[in-house]
Regions:
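Solvent-exposed, low-complexity, repeat-rich "mucin-like" stalks and linkers
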Residues: 23-59
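Hydrophobic, small-residue-rich alpha-helical packing segments that form membrane-like cores
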Residues: 337-451
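Solvent-exposed beta-strand/loop surfaces of large extracellular or lumenal domains
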Residues: 659-684, 704-710
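Serine/threonine-rich, repeat-prone extracellular segments and beta-strand-based repeat modules
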Residues: 56-111, 871-884, 941-953, 957
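Amphipathic, heptad-repeat alpha-helical segments
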Residues: 33, 812-872, 892-941, 963
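Aromatic (Trp/Tyr) and acidic
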Residues: 12, 120-208, 249-273, 289-326, ...
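Extended, well-ordered alpha-helical scaffold segments
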Residues: 138, 145, 212-231, 329-349, ...
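C-terminal beta-rich recognition modules with glycine/proline-rich loops and embedded aromatic residues
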Residues: 461, 538-547, 552, 556-640, ...
């Protein structure tokens, strides 16, 4: 039974009077039973939250960590031989953050295996509204960010976005500004920023109201589309021998493909012949970049590739967004035509030149070029963004049946069976994968379900979303560390050891790539269209939007975040001033003009209010205008019909955090006696007219969002102050992550609170009613002030060690379960590495795991095996906790073999120290070398840097320093 199902069994009555004596520890007295019907051949869908009732009668949702997360356990659960239909079994777990045992409060889920598959919705039940139909009102942080973003988008040089296209198609670049960042002429991801730029100007045009800004955006959209078509037409070449156009399938025959080079010198030759790219090809880099991945060429900007289809997707998405949001039909039609022709180029190449082979060894699977099973499983090189989503969208937008079918086929050519198949069975194959490489693929799978109606695609998307919520998400809604998903339920370990080098006590505090938040919000929105009565989707969107997304834009000047500030004493790493600066500069250029996108969902007879924010909705189909009058963040909202009238049902979300005082009144009359958090309240269909008012009161509740794993003593004590292993959590106020400051060590980042949070008080209003700081909410504890994460930008701490001052001591029981699970995982990695080492011909080129991390894991693995061999009677709890934590840390800090490790930075770091800080006397060559070296340092720290990048940076510095 999932969260939605069991909430229907409970009606939260008026909450009882709370015990106020701080000396009485509030304990969990009851957890609502968890019973799950699990289709045969799948692992059970377990809830990420359970409804708990405390000893004083208070109830709320709490996070739960299930014990079946080891991959072998899930594979066994999905084995129909072991668990046939009709069988039953239990899965244990713990309510995290509870002090009744070392692992939390024990819970069990009763699993019943049933015949058949998951119940999947046949079609979308609801839709969002166009950006132009929902406006954000008032003068607040939402409108401040939106207006800042529109001003900046209008200022971007359209010629800079066109430079690479003209260069790639042999057109004059005189008068065009060279692009920069990740779209610079010597970066193979070029085109990604131009794609985001097109999406950004299209969205900005949809929401802008200033006539001068609209005119600028109109001019730039028109020029972008016209010049892209001019470039694309260079590929419209008729071949007399073939008696048809020269197509994608004709480009780079296999013999040529096998010898194709990926150097910049080679690309300089390729761009001299755009007529060879194939009919319809449009990209900011020659078509050879897309072909090279068919030979399984690795991520290497200098010699091979950098995610060829990732940038193609961004450009397709930008053209589709122009066709969707712009109001000039001629330009919209042309944008759609450009996208369609490129989509058919992709179909042509995939259909005729690629295939899927899953059996055999990797060497056998790669013997012939074009095996998509291998192509899309490559780290970063095989990153395709949302290709399947854009191609599926195109198939919906074109009218020709043959083109529709081809585009949908092309969309499913970007399926990743190695990733998808386990997820379709609810087996967590998310672990250790590149985060933003895979989230957009899930969005694409769900989009293709809209047309192909194969439950496989819906199920893998739903399963992915559920797994991410419980196992990988941080309090702000973000995921990922060093751009990677780590092991399940290791968020705190990953955060507290990020980029940590031997001998250091401070981890690198920036994790949670903003692209991931952007895409998870998008996935949540799309899933909500199929099941809009499930409030969990909007609970997540609210969390991520109100914290990481809104907080990722510098309110003082246009800058966005790549990684986000999450760890100790973190300062938001603002930068990314253009869509081409980085991947997150691209998604950042889109984020801040569409906050209202998920505020409302509708169908012919129902309107769902998902977000409480000051907005005006023009529901054209019903002929009504609905205004939501509130501050932001909102604890009270009044929804009014201001124009028109109509019959419809209204559904209002009760947020998961709304545990006290939630109220809904229609024209002054209360609609229910109680309201269940994380559900929708249905106001049955009535005739709504001007003058009707729906009032929602939703006082923010104080609660702790716990990390799934404890902060181990060895990590907490790295600065020399001995600390015990403890739970770690984020202080929440309603949907807001509340950040403190002044904590540079884990000793300083400790909250002494009672189990009711009664010593945490609400601060007084700052009196600011307009602008970025309007309606600022604060909490206070022991003289410390906590402010919303979206507002606090520098020296912030979000996660604190939680010391419950009224907790009772607990019984200690030696349990090797977690350590044995880690040892099994370590053994799997060791076996994979040894298998690769034994290969006479190294396919793939790189080992599964990078050497330094692998060596660390081996050493700690041996220590852990010795501890287990002693037996439970001869091991102390401290020894067990310490060894488990060290092995967990060793496993979680391992990197794939093709990526550089922190140890690989030693020479580069030494050169950068000697180069010192550049000043006015520093040569331009050295300044550029220092800048590049620092960028490479950041990439390696973040987890995406390669050895060739370090080699290039060292070479640049040595040359500039004349060594």
């Amino acid at each position: 039974m999932d969260l939605k199902q069991f909430t229907l069994l409970i009606g939260v009555a008026s909450l009882p009077s709370l015990v106020t004596a701080a000396t009485v520890y509030r304990t969990i007295s009851k957890v609502t039973a968890v019973a799950v019907d699990c289709p045969e051949g799948t692992a059970p869908r377990l809830p990420n939250l359970v409804w708990v009732t405390y000893s004083d009668g208070y109830s709320e949702y709490r996070q739960v960590r299930w014990a079946n997360s080891p991959l072998a356990d899930e594979q066994a659960e999905a084995d129909a031989q072991k668990h046939p239909a009709g069988s039953q079994y239990e899965v244990g777990g713990f309510v995290i953050g509870d002090e009744s045992t070392d692992n939390g409060y024990p819970v069990k889920a009763q699993i019943k295996v049933v015949a058949g598959g998951y119940q999947t919705p046949e079609k979308e039940v609801a839709h969002t509204f166009s950006l132009a139909d929902v406006s954000i009102d008032g003068d607040n942080r939402l409108t401040h960010n939106r207006d800042e973003a529109i001003r900046e988008i209008c200022s971007w040089d359209v010629t800079q976005q066109l430079y690479n296209y003209r260069d790639t198609y042999g057109l004059s670049t005189e008068g065009y500004t060279k692009s920069d960042g990740w779209d610079s002429p010597d970066t193979k991801l070029k085109g990604h920023g131009s794609g985001h730029y097109m999406s950004a100007i299209a969205q900005a045009y949809a929401v802008a109201t200033n006539p001068e800004q609209k005119a600028i955006l109109r001019k730039n959209i028109t020029r972008m589309v016209n010049e892209l078509r001019e470039c694309q037409e260079k590929t419209f070449v008729y071949n007399k021998e073939l008696k048809r156009n020269w197509e994608a399938r004709d480009f780079a025959p296999e013999a040529e493909l096998r010898e194709m080079k990926g150097t910049w010198a080679a690309f300089d030759e390729y761009k001299k012949h755009p007529e060879l790219y194939g009919y319809g090809y449009i990209n900011a880099i020659p078509a050879q970049h897309c072909a090279l991945i068919e030979m399984y060429r690795a991520y290497n900007n200098s010699d091979w590739v950098w995610a060829p289809y990732y940038s193609v997707h961004k450009q397709l998405a930008g053209l589709i967004d122009i066709a969707t949001y712009f109001d000039d039909k001629k330009i919209c039609d042309k944008a759609l035509l450009i996208a369609k022709d490129m989509g058919l180029w992709v179909w042509n190449r995939m259909h005729y030149r690629t295939y899927v082979k899953q059996d055999g060894t990797q060497d056998e699977r790669r013997a012939k070029p074009g095996n998509r099973y291998e192509m899309w499983d490559m780290y970063i090189a095989g990153e395709v963004g949302g290709m399947s989503e854009s191609l599926a969208r195109l198939s919906e937008m074109v009218s020709n049946p043959d083109e529709k079918a081809k585009l949908l086929e092309a969309a499913n050519c970007f399926d990743a069976p190695k990733f998808y198949d386990p997820l379709s069975k609810n087996i967590d194959d998310i672990r250790t994968r590149h985060a933003n490489q895979h989230i957009p693929m899930i969005i694409g799978a769900l989009r293709s379900y809209k047309s192909n109606q194969k439950p496989y695609y819906y199920n893998l998307a739903e399963n992915f979303w559920r797994l991410v919520q419980g196992r990988y998400m941080y309090a702000m809604g973000g995921v990922g560390n060093g751009e990677m998903f780590r092991q399940p339920y290791t968020q705190i370990l990953s955060m507290a050891t990020n980029g940590l080098q031997e001998g250091e006590s401070q981890a690198y505090p920036d994790i949670n790539e903003t692209c991931c938040a952007y895409n998870l919000v998008k996935l949540s929105k799309d899933l909500n269209c199929y099941n809009p009565d499930n409030a969990q989707y909007l609970d997540y969107i609210e969390r991520t939007l109100y914290n990481q997304i809104i907080g990722s834009l510098n309110p003082d000047q246009y800058q966005t975040c790549y990684q986000y500030a999450v760890g100790l004493n973190a300062t938001k790493p603002f930068g990314n001033e253009t869509p081409q600066s980085t991947c997150c500069g691209g998604t950042g250029s889109e984020n801040h003009t569409k906050y209202q996108q998920s505020a409302y969902f509708a169908n012919d007879h129902t309107l769902w209010v998902g977000l409480y924010m000051p907005t005006t909705l023009h529901w054209k189909e019903k002929g009504v205008t609905i205004k939501q009058d509130c501050l932001w963040p909102a604890q009270h909202s009044a929804i009014k019909i201001t124009e028109g009238e109509g019959n419809f049902t209204l559904k209002l979300r009760v947020p998961y955090w709304a545990t006290q005082g939630f109220s809904i009144k229609v024209n002054g009359k209360e609609v229910a006696k109680s309201y269940q958090p994380s559900t929708y309240v249905e106001l049955e269909q009535k005739h709504w007219k001007v003058g009707d008012v729906v009032e929602i009161d939703m006082p923010f509740s104080k609660h702790i969002e716990y990390g799934a794993d404890k902060l181990s003593s060895d990590v907490a004590s790295l600065d020399g102050t001995p600390l015990k292993t403890s739970w770690v959590g984020t202080l929440m106020y309603g949907p807001l992550v509340m950040a403190g400051t002044g904590a540079q060590t884990w000793n300083q980042a400790t909250l002494n609170i009672d189990s009711r949070l009664s010593n945490i008080t609400v601060g007084e209003s700052n009196g600011v009613t307009t602008g970025a700081g309007a309606n600022l909410l604060t909490l206070k504890l022991d003289g410390k002030e906590f402010q919303p994460d979206y507002y606090r930008n520098a020296n912030s701490t979000h996660y604190y060690r939680i010391n419950l001052t009224d907790a009772k001591s607990k019984k200690v029981k030696i349990d090797f379960t977690e350590l044995n699970s880690l040892l099994n995982l370590a053994a799997e990695r060791k076996a994979d590495q040894e298998k690769w080492n034994a290969l006479s011909q190294k396919v793939p080129e790189y080992a599964p795991w990078a050497p330094f991390g692998y060596e660390r894991m081996q050493k700690v693995m041996a220590q852990a095996q010795e501890l287990v061999a002693k037996g439970k009677k001869k091991v102390t709890q401290d020894e067990l906790e310490g060894t488990t934590a060290i092995l967990n840390r060793a496993i979680n800090t391992m990197r794939p073999g093709n990526l550089a490790e922190m140890e690989d930075l030693r020479e580069l770091s030494g050169l950068l120290r000697r180069a010192s800080c550049p000043d006015d006397n520093t040569s331009d060559e050295l300044k550029e070398a220092i800048s590049y070296g620092r960028m490479v340092q950041k990439y390696v720290t973040d987890g995406s840097g390669t050895h060739n990048m370090i080699h290039a940076a060292v070479g640049k510095l040595k040359k500039a320093m004349k060594q």
